[in-house]
Each structure stands twice: as C-alpha cells, then as structure tokens.
Amino acid sequence: MTATAQQLEFLKNSIKSIQDYPKPGILFRDVTSLLEDPKAYALSIELLVERYKNAGITKVVGTEARGFLFGAPVALGLGVGFVPVRKPRKLPRETIAETYELEYGTDQLEIHVDAIKPGDNVLVVDDLLATGGTIEATVKLIRRLGGKVTDAAFIINLFDLGGEQRLEKQGITCYSLMPFPGH
C-alpha cells in the first residue's frame, strides 16, 4: 500500500496544533492526538511497514520516548527486533553513551552494547524530526556498535528546522508521513 493523498490528509488532520506551547511563538504539533485515534495510529504504522518491508531491515531503533510508540510496532510489522535508545541510567545492561548539543547545553543517549550486531541493517524511527540532533546521536551509537544505518522514518518532519539536511550530511535518507513548517 502506497500512501494516498487522502490517507496522508487523514493523518495530517489527526495532528492537533497548540499555539504558544511550550513557550510563546511556538506552534506545537501534538502527535499524541494521532495516538488517540486507533485508525490514524494503525495507518501510520502500516504505511511505515509498507515502505520498509523489502529493505532488508534487521533491527528498528527508537529514541526515548515517543520513538518507542512508533518504532516498536514498526519492528513487529517488519518481523524484526526493536532496540530502545534511552536517556542515561535507564537501561539495565552495559551501555555506551553519546552526548549531543541542545539549544542550551547538552544531553546524552545510551544503548545496550549487545543490542546491535555488526552488519545489522538498522531503521531509526521517531515521532518527529526537528533539528536532527537526537537522531544524529542515535545514528552515531548504532554505527559505533557496527550497525549500518542509512534510513530514518518519522511521523512528522518540521522541515524548516534543518533536521533533514543535517541527517543527509550523515548519509541518512529521511522519510516522513507529514511535513509541517517548524515554528
């Protein structure tokens, strides 16, 4: 099933926009409203599975927290394992970490050292692409473990914020179901 204009419009209409959240001047795109609609949620997963079903994916990685909500069902649909990337000290086994820059300061992500095997063909899934910093750090973790990652899938791409261009410089092809201007 290739996404039709009608299906994509249905998904886009399931996203609520909240003005001035979390601060004045921001138009927040709330993906949780899509999750509240089982038809929209199921369709978003079906479309991502359809796109990647013949891509030879061996693992799906999702970044905390909403990446879990989309990545895990995509992994099930593809018949492959799901690997969570989390904030520090949330994973119980041995991990490696990657620090990345935020607008004001830094943050860190971790992955289990045994979750990705050398040669794994990994798809990164997250709810939203903005500046790309979180996904860039996720890609670095996967590659440090020997995984191959060339694709990342998103429900929403805030295309004005430069995330897609940032990830393309890292050799990542980005796909999103819904582009929105970023604010």
Curated annotation (Swiss-Prot):
**Source species, domain of life:** Bacteria
Tell me the Gene Ontology biological-process terms attached to this UniProt entry. adenine salvage; AMP salvage; purine ribonucleoside salvage
Q: In which pathway does it act?
A: Purine metabolism; AMP biosynthesis via salvage pathway; AMP from adenine: step 1/1
GO CC term (a single one):
cytosol
Principal subcellular localization: cytoplasm
Keyword Cytoplasm on entry? yes
- Stated EC number for the protein is 2.4.2.7
Q: Which is an annotated GO molecular function term of this record?
A: adenine phosphoribosyltransferase activity
Q: Where in the cell is it found?
A: Cytoplasm
UniProt cross-references to PROSITE patterns, sorted A to Z: PUR_PYR_PR_TRANSFER (PS00103)
CDD domains in alphabetical order: PRTases_typeI
* Entries under InterPro entries matching the protein: Ade_phspho_trans, Adenine_PRTase, PRibTrfase_dom, PRTase-like
Q: Which UniProt keywords apply?
A: Cytoplasm, Glycosyltransferase, Purine salvage, Transferase
Q: Please name one Pfam family that this protein belongs to.
A: Pribosyltran
Task: Provide the catalytic activity annotation.
Answer: AMP + diphosphate = 5-phospho-alpha-D-ribose 1-diphosphate + adenine
**What is the recorded function of this protein according to its Swiss-Prot or TrEMBL entry?**
Catalyzes a salvage reaction resulting in the formation of AMP, that is energically less costly than de novo synthesis.
Q: How does it assemble?
A: Homodimer.
Family to which this protein belongs: Belongs to the purine/pyrimidine phosphoribosyltransferase family.
What the entry lists under HAMAP family is as follows: Aden_phosphoribosyltr (MF_00004)
Name of this chain's protein: Adenine phosphoribosyltransferase
